[in-house]
């Protein structure tokens, strides 16, 4: 179909439209926990979890030169007993058969293989990451502070903005893609109005196949935190764009 729209006000136990990968699971309180916790709810080391929406999304259509105009809204919060919690959560778009790469725990956020994490020609993923861990000795590709980043086929973000991780506080995020300007815009806000903006110009037809899946990924390495998705809505519609030169 030319358009797709869905909305989760929260996540109940019987969520048939979600494909869970790795350690992701629905917790009893209508929250989707992307990374593993022990029996008393404390986050653990070396965990990766992802979820995908079951239906595929038509991102573009070569035969008609149409490209999707899409918008997604989601909210999440992070919790950890540590002073330097890790690693982060990302909204991502990838080919429909996408799976967790081997060795992608920790700073690779469940999205990239260690061998090809910065080799753009080896990847097909567009992601918006919320990265809380930035040790320069290990995550050499990161800026030296917590950040929001837009990743285009690489763990080294195309654009980043400094971000404040707030323990247990919900961050609301809006991501939009405009195919006529080829702009991906991210706006993230905390309840008190603190706001973060970033955008990048990206032609999705050069990054991803015509059909994709959309979802979330999160990971922890030696340091840890919970990655809790509270709500998620997504809508996309194919639009005619100007003929390519």
From Swiss-Prot:
Entry keywords, A to Z: Calcium, Glycoprotein, Lectin, Manganese, Mannose-binding, Metal-binding, Toxin
GO-annotated molecular function: D-mannose binding; metal ion binding; toxin activity
Subunit structure: Homodimer.
pH relationship of activity: Optimum pH is 6-7 for hemagglutinating activity. Activity drops rapidly at lower or higher pH.
Functional note: Mannose/glucose-specific lectin that also binds derivatives N-acetyl-D-glucosamine and alpha-methyl-D-mannopyranoside with even higher affinity. Has hemagglutinating activity towards rabbit erythrocytes. Is toxic towards brine shrimp A.nauplii. In rats, induces dose-dependent paw edema.
Organism: Centrolobium tomentosum (Arariba)
Name the record gives this protein: Mannose/glucose-specific lectin
Pfam families: Lectin_legB
Coiled coil (UniProt feature): none
Residues that hold Mn(2+) according to the record: 129, 131, 142, 147
Classification via InterPro entries: ConA-like_dom_sf (IPR013320), L-lectin (IPR016363), Lectin_LegA_CS (IPR000985), Lectin_legB_Mn/Ca_BS (IPR019825), Legume_lectin_dom (IPR001220), Leguminous_Lectin (IPR050258)
Binding site for Ca(2+): 131, 133, 139, 142
């Amino acid at each position: 179909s030319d358009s797709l729209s869905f909305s989760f006000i929260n996540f109940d136990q019987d969520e048939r439209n979600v494909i869970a990968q790795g350690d992701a699971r629905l917790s009893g309180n209508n929250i989707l926990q992307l990374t593993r916790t022990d029996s008393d709810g404390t986050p653990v080391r070396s965990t990766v979890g992802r979820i995908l929406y079951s239906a595929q999304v038509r991102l573009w259509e070569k035969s008609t030169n149409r490209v999707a105009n899409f918008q997604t809204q989601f909210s999440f919060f992070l919790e950890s007993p540590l002073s330097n919690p890790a690693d982060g959560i990302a909204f991502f778009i990838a080919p429909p058969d996408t799976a967790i790469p081997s060795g992608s725990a920790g700073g690779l956020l469940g999205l990239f293989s260690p061998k090809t994490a910065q080799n753009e020609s080896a990847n097909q993923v567009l992601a918006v990451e919320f990265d809380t861990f930035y040790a320069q000795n290990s995550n050499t590709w990161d800026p030296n502070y917590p950040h929001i980043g837009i990743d285009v086929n690489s763990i080294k973000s195309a654009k980043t903005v400094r971000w404040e991780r707030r323990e247990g506080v919900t961050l609301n995020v809006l991501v939009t893609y405009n195919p006529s300007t080829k702009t991906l815009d991210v706006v993230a806000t905390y309840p008190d109005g603190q706001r973060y903006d970033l955008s990048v110009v990206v032609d999705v037809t050069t990054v991803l196949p015509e059909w994709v899946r959309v979802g979330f990924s999160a990971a922890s390495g030696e340091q840890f935190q919970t990655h809790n998705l509270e709500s998620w809505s997504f809508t996309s519609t194919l639009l005619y764009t100007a003929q390519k030169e």
